[in-house]
Amino acid sequence: MPEIYVYAVEGRSLDQKRGLVQDITAAVVKNFNVDAASVMVQIVESSKDNKAKGGVLFSER
């Protein structure tokens, strides 16, 4: 069972998340030759106060 984790800052809509997991699932099905039902995708969100890039919090960008 392939498991894919997506780490992202919170703020995406449910429609955006739905589209992402559908696209990821389709790519795994195509490239790994597995059934869609066996593909697990988990979106792990963090607040902008808890994530930084280049030493700058996303909430301060």
Which role does the model predict for each range below?
Residues 2-61:
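A domain-level signal for the structural core that forms small-molecule/cofactor-binding pockets
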